[in-house]
Amino acid sequence: MRLHKRLKQNKSLLPSNSTILLAISGGQDSMALLKLIIDLKRLHKWQVEIWHGNHQWHSKSEKTEEELKLWCLKNQISFHSNKADKKEVANEEKARDWRYKNLIMKAKFLSSKNIHFPCTRILTGHTATDRAETVIMNLARGTDLTGLTTLKEQRTIESNIDLTRPLLIFNRNETLEICKDFNLPIWIDPSNENINLTRNKIRKEILPILNSIYKGADSRIASVANRLESYNEDQKLFAKIAIQFCQGEKINSLSRIKLFGLTNSIRQIILSNWLKTMGVKRITALQIEEINTKVSQRKPPGSIHLHGDFLIRWNKEAIYISNKTN
């Protein structure tokens, strides 16, 4: 089994003798994930817990939650759920934050209930296809290297809690085959059919064209993102050292004079990573290019406003960043 082989290669992904919390929507990807994890449960001595987030986005939300709950009870799988307030999930970003907030709270609760089987892993059903969609979307928006390495296999989201995506080695066609082979129920989310949403348009219209031209294009795009991830980690380490070298007199500043002595591409890497370490969550490659151009040698003092009430300003000697909320 492919997942079992991957877990043997990287034992830290899903440690044995622990509780793992699966985010299950009821769609084909999450149901395939649930089946694969349940099959490996006894071998790895896992306590498997299910969490379902009811966004109440459509008329079938309640029915999906109830049917999924009954299916889990029938199969002796522990089930948990939360219902969202409409204000909490007004858009996809808020909905994602709501899901992770509730998943983290549930993981902490499960750990407190069983200290011998702590819940240190939260699993989602993201696949290679999801990763390819994200790469295409970020490329179209304009991104730096970090934007091409999103949807990592594992990342820490809270102290002692990692978000793990075991299905990145599968594409969406393969998760559908798993569901068919094992006669698993699938609950369709109507919101995934709305092509006015960017990701859905990529999923329904763009990726199928790429896959028809180059069979398995989604998996190969995801594979490129995986290879770039390693390169990106090396770049971050380099940037950390470079930022220390270019540190200004104040903690929220960089020496503009030191930046002058570096190449254009290195300056952009330093600026991008510095802004992220200072708390700027949304920054495009075009914005980095604009900042880099405006702070280059012989350019006059100035300022630029960024997302999240951040302000970058510069004079002859240094570049500063501040936030109105601080």
Swiss-Prot record:
Main location: cytoplasm
GO molecular-function term, one example from the UniProt record: ATP binding
Record's keyword terms, sorted: ATP-binding, Cytoplasm, Ligase, Nucleotide-binding, tRNA processing
GO cellular component annotations of the record: cytoplasm
Keyword field contains Cytoplasm: yes
Entries under InterPro entries matching the protein: Rossmann-like_a/b/a_fold, TilS/TtcA_N, tRNA_Ile_lys_synt, tRNA_Ile_lys_synt_N
The EC number(s) this enzyme carries: 6.3.4.19
The UniProt record lists the keyword Cytoplasm: yes
Family indicated by similarity: Belongs to the tRNA(Ile)-lysidine synthase family.
UniProt function note: Ligates lysine onto the cytidine present at position 34 of the AUA codon-specific tRNA(Ile) that contains the anticodon CAU, in an ATP-dependent manner. Cytidine is converted to lysidine, thus changing the amino acid specificity of the tRNA from methionine to isoleucine.
Protein name: tRNA(Ile)-lysidine synthase
Species per Swiss-Prot/TrEMBL record: Prochlorococcus marinus (strain NATL1A)
